[in-house]
Amino acid sequence: MKQSSLDLNLSTKKTRKQELLAQMDRVVPWAALVELIAPYYPEGKNGRPPFALESMLRIHCMQQWFTLSDLAMEEAFFDTPIYREFAGLDAHGRMPDESTILRFRHRLEKHKLADQILATVNDLLAAQGLLLKAGTAVDATLIAAPSSTKNKDKKRDPEMHSSQKGNEWHFGMKAHIGVDADSGLVHTVIGTSGNVADVVEGNSLLHGQETDGFGDAGYQGIDKRPDAKEAVRWHIAMRPGKRRALDKENNPVDALIDQVEKIKASIRAKVEHPFRVIKRQFGYTKVRYRGLKKNTLQLKTLFALSNLWMVRHQLLEAQG
Protein backbone atom coordinates (compact mmCIF):
# COMPACT_ATOMS: atom_id res chain seq x y z
CA MET A 1 0.00 0.00 0.00
CA LYS A 2 1.51 3.29 -1.11
CA GLN A 3 1.08 6.62 0.64
CA SER A 4 3.25 9.03 -1.32
CA SER A 5 2.39 11.94 0.98
CA LEU A 6 3.75 10.00 3.96
CA ASP A 7 7.33 9.59 2.70
CA LEU A 8 10.16 10.78 4.89
CA ASN A 9 11.10 13.90 2.96
CA LEU A 10 13.23 15.74 5.47
CA SER A 11 13.14 18.95 3.43
CA THR A 12 9.49 19.41 4.35
CA LYS A 13 8.49 20.34 7.87
CA LYS A 14 6.15 17.71 9.31
CA THR A 15 3.93 17.66 12.37
CA ARG A 16 4.59 15.04 15.06
CA LYS A 17 1.52 13.16 13.85
CA GLN A 18 2.76 13.11 10.26
CA GLU A 19 6.23 12.04 11.38
CA LEU A 20 4.85 9.18 13.47
CA LEU A 21 2.69 7.92 10.59
CA ALA A 22 5.52 8.28 8.08
CA GLN A 23 7.91 6.27 10.23
CA MET A 24 5.45 3.59 11.34
CA ASP A 25 4.30 3.21 7.74
CA ARG A 26 7.79 1.95 6.97
CA VAL A 27 8.58 -0.13 10.06
CA VAL A 28 5.34 -2.02 10.73
CA PRO A 29 5.52 -5.43 8.97
CA TRP A 30 2.20 -4.95 7.18
CA ALA A 31 2.52 -7.92 4.83
CA ALA A 32 3.32 -10.36 7.66
CA LEU A 33 0.45 -9.08 9.82
CA VAL A 34 -2.02 -9.19 6.92
CA GLU A 35 -0.99 -12.79 6.27
CA LEU A 36 -1.55 -13.55 9.95
CA ILE A 37 -5.06 -12.06 10.07
CA ALA A 38 -6.26 -13.05 6.57
CA PRO A 39 -7.63 -16.52 7.51
CA TYR A 40 -10.01 -14.83 9.96
CA TYR A 41 -11.13 -11.97 7.71
CA PRO A 42 -14.38 -12.27 5.67
CA GLU A 43 -14.11 -12.53 1.91
CA GLY A 44 -17.34 -10.60 1.31
CA LYS A 45 -19.10 -13.12 -0.91
CA ASN A 46 -22.46 -11.63 0.02
CA GLY A 47 -23.45 -7.97 0.19
CA ARG A 48 -21.03 -5.08 -0.13
CA PRO A 49 -17.35 -6.00 -0.49
CA PRO A 50 -15.39 -5.59 2.74
CA PHE A 51 -12.73 -2.95 3.11
CA ALA A 52 -9.20 -4.10 2.35
CA LEU A 53 -7.71 -6.01 5.27
CA GLU A 54 -4.59 -3.85 5.32
CA SER A 55 -6.76 -0.72 5.49
CA MET A 56 -8.60 -2.06 8.52
CA LEU A 57 -5.32 -3.08 10.16
CA ARG A 58 -3.89 0.39 9.59
CA ILE A 59 -7.04 1.91 11.10
CA HIS A 60 -6.70 -0.36 14.13
CA CYS A 61 -3.09 0.76 14.60
CA MET A 62 -4.02 4.43 14.35
CA GLN A 63 -6.56 3.89 17.11
CA GLN A 64 -3.71 2.69 19.34
CA TRP A 65 -1.34 5.52 18.43
CA PHE A 66 -3.87 8.32 18.87
CA THR A 67 -6.24 6.84 21.51
CA LEU A 68 -9.24 7.01 19.19
CA SER A 69 -12.49 5.23 19.99
CA ASP A 70 -14.38 3.54 17.16
CA LEU A 71 -16.69 6.54 16.75
CA ALA A 72 -13.83 9.04 17.01
CA MET A 73 -11.93 7.09 14.34
CA GLU A 74 -14.93 7.17 12.00
CA GLU A 75 -15.31 10.93 12.42
CA ALA A 76 -11.57 11.51 12.03
CA PHE A 77 -11.67 10.26 8.44
CA PHE A 78 -13.62 13.40 7.54
CA ASP A 79 -11.65 15.80 9.75
CA THR A 80 -8.09 14.56 9.24
CA PRO A 81 -7.12 13.71 5.63
CA ILE A 82 -3.81 12.14 6.67
CA TYR A 83 -5.74 9.36 8.44
CA ARG A 84 -7.54 8.52 5.19
CA GLU A 85 -4.27 8.57 3.30
CA PHE A 86 -2.53 6.31 5.81
CA ALA A 87 -5.40 3.79 5.60
CA GLY A 88 -5.38 3.95 1.79
CA LEU A 89 -8.97 5.18 1.60
CA ASP A 90 -10.35 7.16 -1.33
CA ALA A 91 -11.51 10.58 -0.17
CA HIS A 92 -14.53 10.30 -2.50
CA GLY A 93 -15.37 6.71 -1.61
CA ARG A 94 -17.13 5.16 1.36
CA MET A 95 -15.43 5.17 4.75
CA PRO A 96 -15.50 2.47 7.45
CA ASP A 97 -18.14 3.36 9.99
CA GLU A 98 -18.08 2.79 13.74
CA SER A 99 -19.68 -0.67 13.42
CA THR A 100 -17.20 -1.83 10.79
CA ILE A 101 -14.27 -0.74 12.94
CA LEU A 102 -15.84 -2.42 15.98
CA ARG A 103 -16.36 -5.72 14.12
CA PHE A 104 -12.73 -5.78 13.04
CA ARG A 105 -11.57 -5.35 16.62
CA HIS A 106 -13.97 -8.04 17.81
CA ARG A 107 -12.53 -10.40 15.21
CA LEU A 108 -9.02 -9.79 16.54
CA GLU A 109 -10.26 -10.35 20.10
CA LYS A 110 -12.20 -13.50 19.26
CA HIS A 111 -9.17 -15.21 17.76
CA LYS A 112 -6.68 -13.70 20.26
CA LEU A 113 -4.66 -12.29 17.40
CA ALA A 114 -3.01 -9.67 19.60
CA ASP A 115 -0.83 -12.43 21.06
CA GLN A 116 0.24 -13.44 17.56
CA ILE A 117 0.77 -9.84 16.48
CA LEU A 118 3.23 -9.36 19.36
CA ALA A 119 4.94 -12.67 18.52
CA THR A 120 5.17 -11.81 14.81
CA VAL A 121 6.73 -8.42 15.53
CA ASN A 122 9.20 -9.92 17.99
CA ASP A 123 10.21 -12.69 15.58
CA LEU A 124 11.05 -9.98 13.06
CA LEU A 125 13.07 -8.00 15.59
CA ALA A 126 14.88 -11.12 16.83
CA ALA A 127 15.80 -12.04 13.25
CA GLN A 128 17.43 -8.62 12.89
CA GLY A 129 19.38 -9.03 16.12
CA LEU A 130 17.39 -6.39 18.00
CA LEU A 131 15.82 -8.73 20.54
CA LEU A 132 18.14 -10.91 22.63
CA LYS A 133 17.13 -13.52 25.18
CA ALA A 134 19.87 -13.62 27.80
CA GLY A 135 18.07 -11.58 30.45
CA THR A 136 14.63 -10.28 31.37
CA ALA A 137 13.64 -7.22 33.40
CA VAL A 138 10.15 -7.23 34.89
CA ASP A 139 7.85 -4.49 36.14
CA ALA A 140 4.19 -3.52 36.41
CA THR A 141 2.22 -0.32 36.13
CA LEU A 142 -1.28 0.68 37.16
CA ILE A 143 -3.76 1.56 34.42
CA ALA A 144 -6.69 3.64 35.66
CA ALA A 145 -10.29 2.54 35.17
CA PRO A 146 -13.47 4.60 35.75
CA SER A 147 -14.34 4.46 39.44
CA SER A 148 -17.72 6.12 38.98
CA THR A 149 -20.96 4.10 39.17
CA LYS A 150 -22.73 6.56 36.85
CA ASN A 151 -23.00 4.12 33.97
CA LYS A 152 -25.51 1.74 32.41
CA ASP A 153 -24.87 -1.03 34.96
CA LYS A 154 -24.77 1.39 37.92
CA LYS A 155 -21.58 -0.24 39.20
CA ARG A 156 -17.83 -0.28 38.74
CA ASP A 157 -16.09 -2.90 36.62
CA PRO A 158 -15.92 -5.97 38.92
CA GLU A 159 -12.63 -7.10 37.34
CA MET A 160 -10.88 -3.88 38.33
CA HIS A 161 -9.68 -3.28 41.89
CA SER A 162 -8.06 -0.62 44.05
CA SER A 163 -4.35 -0.63 44.79
CA GLN A 164 -2.25 1.60 47.00
CA LYS A 165 0.86 3.26 45.62
CA GLY A 166 2.61 5.39 48.19
CA ASN A 167 -0.08 7.27 50.04
CA GLU A 168 -2.55 7.24 47.15
CA TRP A 169 -5.17 4.70 46.10
CA HIS A 170 -5.76 3.88 42.44
CA PHE A 171 -8.64 1.95 40.87
CA GLY A 172 -8.01 -0.11 37.76
CA MET A 173 -5.83 -2.90 36.42
CA LYS A 174 -2.13 -3.71 36.28
CA ALA A 175 -0.06 -4.27 33.18
CA HIS A 176 2.83 -6.65 33.99
CA ILE A 177 5.60 -6.87 31.39
CA GLY A 178 8.77 -8.81 30.81
CA VAL A 179 11.30 -7.03 28.61
CA ASP A 180 14.61 -7.90 27.03
CA ALA A 181 17.19 -6.67 29.54
CA ASP A 182 19.46 -5.49 26.73
CA SER A 183 17.06 -3.61 24.45
CA GLY A 184 14.01 -2.96 26.62
CA LEU A 185 11.70 -4.56 24.05
CA VAL A 186 8.62 -6.25 25.50
CA HIS A 187 8.28 -10.00 25.03
CA THR A 188 5.58 -10.91 27.59
CA VAL A 189 2.43 -9.07 28.74
CA ILE A 190 0.01 -10.09 31.51
CA GLY A 191 -3.01 -8.11 32.66
CA THR A 192 -4.44 -8.46 36.19
CA SER A 193 -6.68 -6.51 38.51
CA GLY A 194 -4.97 -3.62 40.27
CA ASN A 195 -4.67 -5.34 43.65
CA VAL A 196 -2.42 -8.20 42.47
CA ALA A 197 1.10 -7.84 43.89
CA ASP A 198 3.85 -7.45 41.30
CA VAL A 199 5.79 -10.45 42.59
CA VAL A 200 2.85 -12.81 41.99
CA GLU A 201 3.25 -12.57 38.20
CA GLY A 202 7.02 -12.09 38.12
CA ASN A 203 8.04 -15.62 37.15
CA SER A 204 5.28 -15.80 34.54
CA LEU A 205 6.93 -12.89 32.72
CA LEU A 206 9.97 -14.99 31.80
CA HIS A 207 10.17 -16.44 28.29
CA GLY A 208 12.15 -19.48 29.48
CA GLN A 209 15.46 -18.95 27.72
CA GLU A 210 16.99 -16.26 29.93
CA THR A 211 19.64 -16.87 32.57
CA ASP A 212 19.12 -13.66 34.56
CA GLY A 213 16.12 -11.72 35.82
CA PHE A 214 15.92 -8.15 37.12
CA GLY A 215 13.24 -6.45 39.20
CA ASP A 216 12.68 -3.66 41.69
CA ALA A 217 12.16 -4.18 45.42
CA GLY A 218 8.56 -5.20 44.84
CA TYR A 219 9.89 -8.54 43.57
CA GLN A 220 11.72 -9.45 46.79
CA GLY A 221 11.37 -13.20 47.40
CA ILE A 222 10.55 -14.05 43.78
CA ASP A 223 13.18 -16.80 43.72
CA LYS A 224 11.49 -18.50 46.69
CA ARG A 225 8.03 -18.69 45.15
CA PRO A 226 6.57 -22.07 44.04
CA ASP A 227 6.77 -21.10 40.36
CA ALA A 228 10.43 -19.98 40.53
CA LYS A 229 12.69 -21.14 37.70
CA GLU A 230 15.88 -22.84 38.92
CA ALA A 231 17.90 -21.78 35.88
CA VAL A 232 17.26 -18.06 36.43
CA ARG A 233 19.43 -15.89 38.69
CA TRP A 234 17.37 -13.02 40.04
CA HIS A 235 18.93 -9.61 40.73
CA ILE A 236 16.35 -7.77 42.83
CA ALA A 237 16.74 -4.24 44.14
CA MET A 238 17.46 -3.72 47.80
CA ARG A 239 14.59 -2.16 49.72
CA PRO A 240 14.96 1.65 49.75
CA GLY A 241 15.17 1.92 53.53
CA LYS A 242 17.89 -0.70 53.72
CA ARG A 243 19.88 0.98 50.97
CA ARG A 244 19.64 4.39 52.65
CA ALA A 245 21.11 2.82 55.77
CA LEU A 246 24.33 1.85 53.95
CA ASP A 247 27.42 3.66 55.24
CA LYS A 248 28.99 4.33 51.85
CA GLU A 249 31.47 6.88 53.17
CA ASN A 250 33.10 4.76 55.86
CA ASN A 251 32.39 1.15 54.96
CA PRO A 252 34.01 -0.19 51.75
CA VAL A 253 31.64 -3.17 51.67
CA ASP A 254 28.61 -0.88 51.86
CA ALA A 255 30.08 1.30 49.13
CA LEU A 256 30.52 -1.76 46.90
CA ILE A 257 26.95 -2.91 47.61
CA ASP A 258 25.69 0.53 46.59
CA GLN A 259 27.62 0.34 43.32
CA VAL A 260 26.04 -3.04 42.58
CA GLU A 261 22.61 -1.51 43.26
CA LYS A 262 23.35 1.25 40.76
CA ILE A 263 24.26 -1.30 38.10
CA LYS A 264 21.07 -3.26 38.74
CA ALA A 265 19.05 -0.04 38.57
CA SER A 266 20.57 0.89 35.20
CA ILE A 267 19.47 -2.47 33.77
CA ARG A 268 16.01 -2.23 35.34
CA ALA A 269 15.54 1.21 33.80
CA LYS A 270 15.05 -0.49 30.43
CA VAL A 271 11.64 -1.73 31.57
CA GLU A 272 10.41 1.85 32.02
CA HIS A 273 10.85 2.73 28.35
CA PRO A 274 7.87 0.76 26.96
CA PHE A 275 5.57 2.17 29.64
CA ARG A 276 6.69 5.67 28.73
CA VAL A 277 6.03 5.05 25.03
CA ILE A 278 2.47 3.79 25.44
CA LYS A 279 1.58 6.43 28.03
CA ARG A 280 3.30 9.54 26.69
CA GLN A 281 3.82 8.84 22.99
CA PHE A 282 0.57 6.95 22.37
CA GLY A 283 -1.43 8.65 25.14
CA TYR A 284 -2.66 5.43 26.77
CA THR A 285 -3.42 6.35 30.39
CA LYS A 286 -6.70 4.56 31.15
CA VAL A 287 -8.50 1.39 30.15
CA ARG A 288 -10.84 1.65 27.17
CA TYR A 289 -13.06 -1.38 27.77
CA ARG A 290 -14.73 -3.27 30.59
CA GLY A 291 -13.06 -6.47 31.76
CA LEU A 292 -9.48 -7.68 31.81
CA LYS A 293 -9.54 -9.76 28.64
CA LYS A 294 -10.19 -6.99 26.14
CA ASN A 295 -7.90 -4.53 27.87
CA THR A 296 -5.07 -7.06 28.08
CA LEU A 297 -5.37 -7.82 24.37
CA GLN A 298 -5.17 -4.11 23.62
CA LEU A 299 -2.06 -3.85 25.80
CA LYS A 300 -0.39 -6.61 23.79
CA THR A 301 -1.07 -4.71 20.57
CA LEU A 302 0.18 -1.48 22.14
CA PHE A 303 3.43 -3.10 23.26
CA ALA A 304 3.96 -4.71 19.84
CA LEU A 305 3.69 -1.24 18.32
CA SER A 306 5.85 0.31 21.05
CA ASN A 307 8.58 -2.23 20.26
CA LEU A 308 8.58 -1.07 16.64
CA TRP A 309 8.58 2.57 17.71
CA MET A 310 11.52 2.08 20.07
CA VAL A 311 13.74 0.59 17.34
CA ARG A 312 12.33 2.53 14.40
CA HIS A 313 15.63 4.30 13.70
CA GLN A 314 17.53 1.00 13.50
CA LEU A 315 14.84 -0.47 11.24
CA LEU A 316 14.80 2.57 8.96
CA GLU A 317 18.59 2.58 8.76
CA ALA A 318 18.57 -1.09 7.80
CA GLN A 319 16.13 -0.31 4.98
CA GLY A 320 18.53 2.29 3.61
Label each PLM-derived region with a short phrase:
Residues 1-31, 38-39, 317-320:
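Charged, often Cys/His-bearing segments associated with DNA-binding zinc-finger transcription factors
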Residues 46-48, 67-69, 108-109:
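N-terminal core-binding DNA-recognition domain of tyrosine recombinases/integrases
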Residues 3-7, 11, 211-212, 217-293, ...:
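Helix-centered, glycine/charged polyanion-binding patches within enzymatic domains
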Residues 2-5, 53, 71, 75-78, ...:
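Polybasic low-complexity intrinsically disordered regions
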Residues 34-54:
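An N-terminal domain-cap segment
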Residues 26-29, 48-54, 93-96, 263, ...:
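Secondary-structure capping and boundary motifs in well-ordered enzyme cores
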Residues 65-71, 185, 282-287, 307-320:
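Short helix-capping/linker segments at secondary-structure and domain boundaries
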Residues 55-67:
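Alpha-helical support elements that line or immediately flank enzyme active sites
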